[in-house]
């Protein structure tokens, strides 16, 4: 047990990668608080893990909800050693040309409020506890934080923003809090899309990612969600990762070394925009 006696707060921890992280961190001996919007899934977590998990219903877009989560984690477990801002939505690779003008502002706000502001809120709310424990923050990024075509412009821009956030906060919070990021790859999960684009009930598990990634990734398959959790355990383990801050870990099956399949992503733009030169 690498994390025995540690206290962890995870946002978006009731499904997908977040759920796998909860399971792994509990297995490593940690106590885990989870902020999530689904009361039903939080209840399942508490049933499965008993006193090792505290479920907190809330919205990551609300600073007050994030502060309540931090307060309840400290009240229950005495501290916060590791914060994992993880809640997010995906834009289902909706290209700029396909974004409806009437929905663009709302979609931008929704993606950035959850995927970026929600992360900033989490750190702001937990900062006193993290400084007190000489703790660490591990941001869930995505391969879209490093390469194009891991999403549309909204998702890709949001994830690139998190890369900048890792670097800035690693500087601002040193030497008291370490800040790192994990750029995971495709996951078969319940990850939803923006409600403002009519994708609020659409899950990424409906996309045939396994077949797509099998021919793209150098490792020849899509990793199982549980396989991503080891990187987070590494960064959270004080004895193993004490020198690590500002680190960005590409953890996506080798996507960055696969080479390019096409030099241009806009080969169909003329047809899409009905332009006839």
UniProtKB/Swiss-Prot annotation:
Residues that bind substrate: 142
Binding site for NAD(+): 9-36, 59, 159
EC number, UniProt record: 1.3.1.56
Enzyme class: oxidoreductase
GO biological-process terms attached to the record: catabolic process
Keywords of the record: Aromatic hydrocarbons catabolism, NAD, Oxidoreductase
GO molecular function ontology, one term from the record: oxidoreductase activity, acting on NAD(P)H, oxygen as acceptor
Pathway: Xenobiotic degradation; biphenyl degradation; 2-hydroxy-2,4-pentadienoate and benzoate from biphenyl: step 2/4
Family annotation (Pfam families): adh_short
Catalysis performed (reactions): (2R,3S)-3-phenylcyclohexa-3,5-diene-1,2-diol + NAD(+) = biphenyl-2,3-diol + NADH + H(+)
Record flagged with keyword Thylakoid: no
Active site, renumbered: 155 (proton acceptor)
Protein family: Belongs to the short-chain dehydrogenases/reductases (SDR) family.
Name of the protein: Cis-2,3-dihydrobiphenyl-2,3-diol dehydrogenase
